[in-house]
């Protein structure tokens, strides 16, 4: 499992990742700037000679091994069942990204798999043995948004990916 950061494309020296590389990330989560008090603590520590990178790296400790993570994934897969109506729901949501006029490049099958696995993990974290439509819906944007490319017209109109994601899952009938 790899965690990575991506600088905004607007920054000098940064370039957008190709679609095939973006598709390999499970989630895209946007993190905002720190609160004022947190930033002041950071500045105070830095002013006092503390190098934040060194402090952070020294304090990092693994919480689980790669083997344990693999076992946890297997356990989740065995404990959380996936009903056919949830499979259909996920497939229909992802397919909508491929057939929307605002989309230049839609999400592929890897996105469907990612949405299924993330939904399964959400159910397990909620101590349920089944996936709910709300599990799926809550993960649509973090799982799909970075895999979808807006059409130039949609970008010029100022359509936000979050609005597109909401529109897409609202078009799909929720299973009962």
Q: Model segments located where?
A:
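An amphipathic alpha-helix signature
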Residues: 36, 40-44, 87, 91, ...
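Hydrophobic aliphatic residues
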Residues: 21, 43-47, 94, 140, ...
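N-proximal short alpha-helices
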Residues: 12, 59-60, 85, 109, ...
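C-terminal engagement/docking regions of AAA+ P-loop ATPases
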Residues: 74-79, 88, 97-176
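Short, structured loop/turn "capping" segments at alpha-beta junctions
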Residues: 36-38, 50-55, 82-88, 97-103
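Canonical AAA+ ATPase core
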Residues: 1-64, 69-79, 120-122
């Amino acid at each position: 499992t790899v965690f990575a950061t991506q600088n905004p494309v607007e920054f000098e020296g940064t370039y957008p990742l190709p679609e095939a590389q973006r598709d390999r990330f499970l989630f895209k989560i946007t993190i905002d700037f720190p609160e004022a008090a947190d930033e002041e603590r950071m500045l105070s520590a830095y002013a006092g000679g503390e190098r934040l990178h060194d402090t952070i790296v020294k304090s990092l400790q693994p919480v689980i091994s790669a083997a344990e993570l693999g076992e946890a994934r297997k356990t989740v897969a065995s404990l959380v069942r996936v009903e056919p109506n949830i499979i259909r729901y996920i497939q229909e949501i992802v397919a909508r990204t491929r057939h929307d006029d605002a989309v230049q490049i839609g999400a592929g099958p890897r996105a469907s798999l990612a949405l299924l696995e993330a939904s399964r993990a959400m159910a397990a974290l909620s101590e349920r043995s089944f996936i709910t439509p709300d599990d799926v819906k809550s993960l649509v944007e973090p799982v799909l948004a970075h895999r979808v490319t807006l059409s130039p017209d949609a970008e010029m109109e100022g359509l936000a990916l979050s609005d597109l994601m909401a529109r897409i899952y609202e078009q799909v009938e929720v299973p009962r």
